[in-house]
Amino acid sequence: MKYFFQNKKNIHIKNETFNNRITILLSLIIITIILVLSRITFLQIIVSKKLIYKSNLRSLRTQIEFNQRGNITDRLGYPLAINIPVKNICIDPKLLFSKQTHIYPNLKWKMLSTVLSIPLSEIFYRIKYSKNNHFIYLAHKVNPEISEYISQLHIPGIYILDDFKRFYPFGKLTSQLIGFTNIDNEGIEGVEKSFNKLLMGKPGKKQIITDRYGRIIEQHNLVNKIQSHDIILSIDCSFQKFIYHILNQAVMSNKAKFGVAILVNIPTGEILSMVNTPSYDPNNSSELFKNNPLIRNKAITDIFELGSTVKPMIIMKALEKKIITPETVINTSSLVVNKHIIHDVSYHHALTASDILKKSSNTGVSRLALSIPISELIDIYSKFELGKSTNLGLIGERNGVLNTNKKHWSDLDKVTLSFGYGLMATPLQLARIYTTIGRYGLSKPLSIIVKNDTNLKNDIFSKQVFSKKIIKTVINMLEEVAKPGGAGFKAAIKGYRIAVKTGTAKKINSKGKYDNKYVSYIVGFAPVSNPTFCLMIMINEPKSNKYYGGEIAAPIFKTIMQKILKIKNIKPDAYL
């Protein structure tokens, strides 16, 4: 009986102990739940914004979203500058170090080094040097085949981003005009630079959230992005191609420093071709360095004295002042001006005003210039915008030189001004003068970008700068230049009436003295019955035994213009 009660007491004690333990356990659970809920409440309500901010610092990033650069095409849609897809190989150094990845030259890294032609030591140096950065470029503009190979290596921290690079289908034929871009796809020469904002648009920004491996898991709306635009040039690639080859052959055969050819549509003012030779390949990056003289578009960046190509304007002014008629006979023997002898290449005692242009007589225009006030000589040059930029929109175009503010002009100044010395212009500005003459004195802006309203704008800004009747008379005189006995007879095209003027100018050296180096010109238009195409040819420093414009440039003019008239099915007008 005693044992029974003793045992019952023990059971009671055990039950009480068990109950106490349950109570303690339940209390601990309840306390834990309360603590967890309190912590959750604290995190979710009190400091949630702060934690989200800190988290975002690790995973939320702003990404720049670039546009595909706009294409450049000719007037018929042929591509002059396009984008081809490439890849950029990138590394996340911070990710590699945060994961405490042991970077060592294993086989995969060696394969990466080999395919990119980057020494392994350099790769590791870049990673270590930028260990606090999430992003560095390892290689730019990699072919997709190479990037796919790298992708299959599955190297931690290596990322591949889409990109593009410029390709120029016509290469050397359009390089100085079109230019090229840098590694960031920004235009740094030619049309690429001049219209860079239009071609690039404006990149936008978007926020992305990444996981611990750098993969994008969420992205927010793109903001502030302005779309890029394509550009259509007035250039006709069919013209550009054959003009380049003809001019290039002429430059080589004459051992010249370089040549420029410009073709303009006279009625519209559109530039149909702008050629420089020798040229360079814009697809070969090794040729794209700043001091390469081949990069300049010399049609707009270089200025030269114009030689006899300015003489028609002196004749115009003399006709306007009724000093002469086309049949007026003028003394063309040598004359002395301020102790300087002015003479012609071929001696003629006297010539008609028309023959002064035909034979390109310096003495003839000199005597006319001496009879005209200097202010009126400057005025006629200014009316044809000599010395002024064409405002074509191409960066790098220079103004010419026409000293309108000079107070004291000697007779020698007037005389030399009449045959193209003491003033300077770009080849494009010379082409503009003769385009205006071909339009019978109606000046319109030149253009190289095709727009729906181009002709409307050109009409708005057009103005008659000189008497239409007088200019028609001068055009008839210029027609004689290409006939037998004329300075430009080698430019003659059978069956067609053409109006041309040749020119030859000595070059000034760095000391301001004239060297025995020359610039040879011919500029004119066809057909005379309906002036449609203006062509300017300039050959710089021919080193053959010939250097006169009529000998060097005239045959080039003939070959090119003859082909243009044939391609465009312009009917012969010589017998109309």
Curated annotation (Swiss-Prot):
Pfam families: PBP_dimer, Transpeptidase
SS bonds (residue pairs): none
Keywords recorded for this protein, A-Z: Carboxypeptidase, Cell cycle, Cell division, Cell inner membrane, Cell membrane, Cell shape, Cell wall biogenesis/degradation, Hydrolase, Membrane, Peptidoglycan synthesis, Protease, Septation, Transmembrane, Transmembrane helix
Enzyme class at the top of the EC tree: hydrolase
Membrane topology: Single-pass membrane protein
Stretches that traverse the bilayer: 22-42
GO biological process: cell wall organization; division septum assembly; FtsZ-dependent cytokinesis; peptidoglycan biosynthetic process; proteolysis; regulation of cell shape
Record-level GO cellular component terms: plasma membrane
Compartments where located: Cell inner membrane
Any one GO molecular-function label of the UniProt entry: penicillin binding
InterPro entries to which the protein is assigned, alphabetical: Bact_Transpept/Beta-Lactamase (IPR050515), Beta-lactam/transpept-like (IPR012338), FtsI_transpept (IPR037532), PBP_dimer (IPR005311), PBP_dimer_sf (IPR036138), PCN-bd_Tpept (IPR001460)
Active site per the UniProt annotation: 308
EC number: 3.4.16.4
Pathway as given in its UniProt record: Cell wall biogenesis; peptidoglycan biosynthesis
Catalytic activity: Preferential cleavage: (Ac)2-L-Lys-D-Ala-|-D-Ala. Also transpeptidation of peptidyl-alanyl moieties that are N-acyl substituents of D-alanine
Family membership noted in the UniProt record: Belongs to the transpeptidase family. FtsI subfamily.
Purpose: Catalyzes cross-linking of the peptidoglycan cell wall at the division septum.
Protein's recorded name: Peptidoglycan D,D-transpeptidase FtsI
Organism, scientific name: Buchnera aphidicola subsp. Baizongia pistaciae (strain Bp)
Classification of source organism: Bacteria, Pseudomonadati, Pseudomonadota, Gammaproteobacteria, Enterobacterales
Name of the gene: ftsI
